[in-house]
């Protein structure tokens, strides 16, 4: 129950600010190109079950969004070495979780948070990482 309340609070915070879209977004190919060039750190916020099911983008950090806001914040800080100005691109299944996480991280002082809005499976924003046949790494032990 406590976990559900924390997630609800995390999701409500950006909505209270009245901002329906935090922006900026990246397409899956642009996120892949930027991550490959070392210009952005890609972070997959899906569940371990989803990582095992499809694999993950090469070199992506992994943080389970459903573990709550404290875990999200501390894990992202660890991934970027504490640098809230480091460019990060968040990816989930369809862009829904990343939209909420993007707003939350921006509210926590992160300045360069991108949303891969088409996600892994696709959305109205685009066909997604999987259908675009972008590279994946197996994550059998996730």
Model-derived features: where do they sit?
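Short, surface-exposed ligand- or partner-binding patches at beta-edge/loop junctions that are enriched
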Residues: 91
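Bacterial N-terminal signal peptides
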Residues: 6-16
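Positively charged n-region of N-terminal signal peptides that target proteins for export
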Residues: 1-4
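Rhodanese-like catalytic fold shared by cysteine-dependent sulfurtransferases
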Residues: 18-37, 48-87, 98-142
